[in-house]
């Protein structure tokens, strides 16, 4: 199965964000949602949906998202993405390309990815920022169907994230998990946790002092959480990263949604 999702935004004469170009092939679908109380006023809320029960060997998902200048998009997904069992040497693949226009804002938090026994999955995410643009991007991965006693039974997971501005890298994050060859339960790895989450925030309108204050606020929020291991780090330029280990996916997702609201509220783009 080769599936494509293509969407872009535009700004109306009333200053509201709307879908512009929109193309999907099965099993993808996108549904726009009613406006709700949010710090990004006049932004567009949308849900990325899929009718597939999971990814199979040879599946390729191609996602392209483009935000026009001065638009804002909050994009969530409908359900967990499950990578099903497959033969040795087989993989499912996802490629995501995102471009943010000047003064644009994107909040993108897909549901967790679940790696089933004997699965192989490779994903690449490339995001290009523009002047004064803002990004809140999250990823959550489960090491297996934990409630079924499945832990690190997948074959291979590879993830590459690159965020750049004017073709210069701002963030590069690479994950390689090979359970048969790596001690993934050791100290400084997953230890006894079953879910990992990463949330990256980049705002090119913020200076280092402002970002540092936001890091301190999120560290205070992290200290209130139970049954999670949380780290908040300031990026070299214009942003921060939150890394979380936990025993359940939903608590990471709820935390990231809460952090997203905190970060949106401090946006200085009108």
UniProtKB/Swiss-Prot annotation:
List S-S links within the chain: none
Task: State one Pfam family annotation.
Answer: UreD
Aminoacyl-tRNA synthetase: present as a keyword of the record?
A: no
Cytoplasm among the record's keywords? yes
Q: Name one GO cellular component term.
A: cytoplasm
**Where is this chain's protein located in or outside the cell?**
Cytoplasm
Assigned keywords, A-Z: Chaperone, Cytoplasm, Nickel insertion
The principal location of this protein is cytoplasm
Q: Recorded GO terms, molecular function?
A: nickel cation binding
Task: Describe the family membership recorded for this protein in Swiss-Prot or TrEMBL.
Answer: Belongs to the UreD family.
Q: Main role?
A: Required for maturation of urease via the functional incorporation of the urease nickel metallocenter.
What does the subunit section of this Swiss-Prot or TrEMBL entry state? UreD, UreF and UreG form a complex that acts as a GTP-hydrolysis-dependent molecular chaperone, activating the urease apoprotein by helping to assemble the nickel containing metallocenter of UreC. The UreE protein probably delivers the nickel.
Protein name in UniProt: Urease accessory protein UreD
Q: Upper taxonomic classification of the species?
A: Bacteria, Pseudomonadati, Pseudomonadota, Gammaproteobacteria, Pasteurellales
């Amino acid at each position: 199965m080769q599936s494509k999702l293509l969407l872009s935004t535009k700004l109306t004469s009333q200053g509201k964000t709307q879908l512009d170009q929109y193309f999907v092939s099965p099993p993808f679908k996108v549904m726009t949602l009613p406006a709700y109380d949010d710090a990004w006023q006049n932004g567009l809320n949308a849900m990325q949906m899929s009718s597939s029960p999971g990814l199979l060997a040879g599946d390729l998902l191609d996602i392209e998202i483009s935000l026009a200048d001065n638009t804002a998009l909050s994009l969530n997904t409908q359900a967990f993405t499950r990578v099903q069992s497959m033969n040795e040497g087989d993989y499912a693949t996802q490629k995501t390309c995102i471009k943010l226009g000047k003064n644009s804002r994107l909040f993108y938090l897909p549901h967790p990815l679940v790696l089933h026994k004997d699965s192989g999955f490779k994903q690449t995410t490339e995001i290009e920022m523009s002047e004064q643009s803002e990004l809140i991007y999250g990823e959550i991965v489960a090491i297996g169907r934990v409630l079924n006693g499945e832990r690190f039974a997948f074959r291979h997971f590879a993830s590459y994230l690159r965020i750049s501005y004017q073709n210069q890298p701002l963030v590069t994050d690479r994950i390689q998990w090979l359970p048969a060859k790596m001690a993934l339960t050791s100290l400084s790895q997953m230890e006894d946790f079953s879910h990992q989450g990463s949330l990256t925030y980049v705002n090119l309108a913020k200076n280092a002092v402002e970002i540092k204050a936001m890091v301190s606020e999120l560290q205070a929020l992290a200290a209130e959480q139970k049954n999670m291991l949380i780290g908040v780090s300031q990026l070299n330029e214009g942003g921060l990263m939150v890394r979380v280990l936990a025993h359940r996916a939903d608590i990471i997702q709820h935390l990231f949604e809460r952090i997203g609201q905190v970060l949106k509220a401090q946006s200085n783009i009108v």
